[in-house]
C-alpha cells in the first residue's frame, strides 16, 4: 500500500502538469490542506475571492479562466457547516457558468453525514438532501473521504469516489512500533470499520464496546467484548465530535486493564466540550486525527497528533483527472 503519511514539500513537482487542464480551487474551509494538495501535484491553486455581504450572503468569484478545464473544488463542509456547504455550491455554480469542462467537489469531510437515515418519525434524511443539493448545483463528480456510512455514496446519482484515511493513520501507528495491539470499536455501529482497520494492522485482534446512547451527544459505555487487559488499545472511529463516545470508551478500557490507549479518527470535528475531555493527561497516550478539518490553534494539546491527507487526496485527484483507478490506491 502506498505511503501517504506526510505532505510533499519539495521544489520538484511530483507530476508533469505543464500542459494539463487540471485546476484546483480552494474554498475557505481548509485552505492549508488545499495548499498541501497543490504542492503534491506541483501546481498552484486558482485564485478565488470569497466574501460575505452585510446581510450574511456569500459572494464568490474565480479569478482566472477555467474554460474547458477539469476543476477540483476543495471544500470540507465542516463548521460553520451551512456556510461551507453554501460556499461550495456557489463555487460550483461559478465554475459551471465559467464553462469548466468537468467539476469535481473534493469533500474531505462531508457535513450532515450522520443524518443518513430516519430514526424517528417526521425526520429529514439530510445527508441525502445534501447530495441532491450538490448535484443540482452542477457538480459532475464527488471525491469524499471516510463517509460516516457507506450508504451515503449511493445517495449520489453522479460518480462518487470514496477514499479512506486509514493508510495515513496506520502508517503513523506502525512507525510507533506498538506491541500487543488490540483495535477497539467504540460502539457496535463501528464494528465493520474497526474490523477493516484491524486487518490492515497485521490482522490485530478486535474488541467492541457495547454502548447505549440515551440522547444526542450523550454516550454511555457499558461493557467490553474482547480481551484488552495488558494490551495497547487503539480506539478507531470516523470522527471525534464532543469526545463523549471515545472518552467513555477509553475510561472503560482503562478500568478493564488496557496498558496504553490511543484514539484514532479521520475527522477532528472537536465540538465543545471535546477539548476538556480529550486533553486529560491520564486518559489517552495520543489522540491521532487527520487534517480533513482544520484544527484551530486553541484546540491543540500535547497528546494531539494531526496527520496530513494531502498526498492521498492529491493522488486521488490525479487519478480521476487521468481516468485511472482510485480504488487501487487501497489494495
UniProtKB/Swiss-Prot annotation:
EC number: 2.7.6.1
Binding site for Mg(2+) 2: 187
Required cofactor(s): Mg(2+)
Enzyme class: transferase
GO cellular component, one term: ribose phosphate diphosphokinase complex
Pfam families noted in UniProt: Pribosyl_synth, Pribosyltran_N
Cofactor, free-text remark: Binds 2 Mg(2+) ions per subunit.
Cell location: Cytoplasm
Any GO BP: purine nucleotide biosynthetic process
Record key words, sorted: ATP-binding, Cytoplasm, Kinase, Magnesium, Metal-binding, Nucleotide biosynthesis, Nucleotide-binding, Transferase
Binding positions (D-ribose 5-phosphate): 213, 237, 241-245
Protein function: Involved in the biosynthesis of the central metabolite phospho-alpha-D-ribosyl-1-pyrophosphate (PRPP) via the transfer of pyrophosphoryl group from ATP to 1-hydroxyl of ribose-5-phosphate (Rib-5-P).
Protein name as catalogued: Ribose-phosphate pyrophosphokinase
Amino acid at each position: 500500500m502506498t505511503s501517504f503519511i506526510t505532505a510533499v514539500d519539495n521544489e520538484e513537482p511530483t507530476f508533469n502538469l505543464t500542459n494539463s487542464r487540471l485546476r484546483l480551487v480552494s474554498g475557505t474551509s481548509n485552505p492549508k490542506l488545499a495548499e498541501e494538495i497543490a504542492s503534491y501535484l506541483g501546481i498552484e491553486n486558482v485564485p478565488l475571492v470569497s466574501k460575505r455581504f452585510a446581510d450574511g450572503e456569500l459572494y464568490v468569484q474565480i479569478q482566472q479562466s477555467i474554460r474547458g478545464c477539469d476543476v477540483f473544488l476543495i471544500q470540507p463542509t465542516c463548521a460553520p457547516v451551512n456556510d461551507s456547504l453554501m460556499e461550495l455550491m456557489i463555487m460550483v455554480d461559478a465554475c459551471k457558468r465559467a464553462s469548466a469542462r468537468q467539476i469535481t467537489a473534493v469533500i474531505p469531510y462531508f457535513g450532515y453525514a450522520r443524518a443518513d437515515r430516519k430514526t424517528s418519525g417526521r425526520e429529514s434524511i439530510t445527508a441525502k438532501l445534501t447530495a441532491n443539493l450538490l448535484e443540482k448545483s452542477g457538480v459532475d463528480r464527488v471525491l469524499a473521504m471516510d463517509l460516516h456510512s457507506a450508504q451515503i455514496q449511493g445517495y449520489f446519482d453522479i460518480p462518487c469516489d470514496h477514499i479512506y484515511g486509514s493508510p495515513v493513520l496506520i502508517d503513523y501507528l506502525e512507525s510507533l512500533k506498538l506491541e500487543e495491539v488490540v483495535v477497539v470499536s467504540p460502539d457496535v455501529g463501528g464494528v465493520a470499520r474497526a474490523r477493516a482497520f484491524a486487518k490492515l494492522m497485521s490482522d490485530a485482534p478486535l474488541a467492541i464496546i457495547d454502548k447505549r446512547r440515551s440522547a444526542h451527544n450523550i454516550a454511555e459505555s457499558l461493557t467490553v467484548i474482547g480481551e484488552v487487559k495488558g494490551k495497547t488499545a487503539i480506539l478507531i472511529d470516523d470522527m471525534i465530535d464532543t469526545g463523549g463516545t471515545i472518552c467513555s470508551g477509553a475510561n472503560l478500557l482503562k478500568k478493564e486493564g488496557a496498558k496504553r490507549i490511543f484514539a484514532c479518527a479521520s475527522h477532528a470535528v472537536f465540538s465543545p466540550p471535546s477539548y476538556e475531555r480529550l486533553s486529560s493527561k491520564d486518559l489517552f497516550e495520543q489522540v491521532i486525527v487527520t487534517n480533513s478539518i482544520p484544527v484551530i490553534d486553541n484546540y491543540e494539546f500535547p497528546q494531539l497528533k494531526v496527520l496530513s491527507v494531502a498526498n492521498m487526496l492529491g493522488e486521488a485527484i490525479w487519478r480521476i483527472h487521468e481516468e485511472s483507478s482510485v480504488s487501487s490506491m487501497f489494495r
